[in-house]
Amino acid sequence: PVCGWGVYADMKDSNQNAVYLSNFGLGLGRDYYQKQSESNTEAINKYQVFVADIFKLLGDANADEKAQKQVAFEKDLAKLMLTNEEDRDPNLSYNPQTMSELSKLVKNLNIPAFLKKVGVNTDKVIVGEIRLYKEYDKFVNEKNLPLLKDYLRYNLVASNAGNLDGALDELSFNFYSKYLNGQQEQRPMNKRALSLINGVVGEAFGKLYVEKYFPAKAKEEMVTLVDYLKKSFAEHIKNVTWMSDATKEKALHKLSTFKVKVGYPDKWEDYSKMSLSADASLFENLIKVTQWAYQKELDKVGKPVDKTKWEMTPQTVNAYYNPLYNEIVFPAA
């Protein structure tokens, strides 16, 4: 999108949600544009062919020209984006802006009016790519309007290629999965369908999974085990010789606030307002899923963070640490 938004925990106050502004997306990782090499140049050239092929499938006669302009546009955007090295500094991507400041920052696009129109009622946003936003008017202007329309049209189709038709799906697979990531064959359709459903209603699947493989008793036993480990670790911190007393105090405080989630959420996701239809196409149902998810985002604006939520489903074979919440999560699988 030209300008998008999302609701996440405020980096400077993890108990409160904040509205974060996103910006133009790139068809390739920013490193491809920012770091010159033969392999990156080859990837950009193949990407341009891919973009042209999408436009051709959409019936555009001047597809090659549109693709060339879009890639040049993305190159210019990438020059202003944070590098991977800069992105490691969280302070560089934390730039709070009031609506008044945002209006002065970007003049050609009325972002405060846009946010209000789409239901986002906030008096402050956090901008990640502030360097790019300072130059937004160079990209969003009347001269670029045809290019912006093509850019948005392309991104709408390309981001849904796997859910539209076979030709688009094959194009997307051949470029992103096969060329960029080395995957030689598409996964079987049943596995792709399972992944899609898991992504949409993952906790509904998770509830079935834990009923069969991870009963409440198993969760209780794991929570008890983790509590013992925390107590043991606290004793270890107290006895180490290479830490100062002040450092030990901070470490013990962090450990005392350290949260562990095991198995599955105490409160399951509520899908009752997700309206799907057996008579609708896959894409039509996915639009309904998007509308449901959009409303969930709107509901978080201005509210405290719900720290009972999980970022993984119980059936996921993985684990994660969330530094903002100081929590570690072990799904049942």
State what each model feature region is.
Residues 1-224, 228:
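Noncatalytic, helix-rich "gating/capping" subdomain that lines the substrate-entry/channel surface
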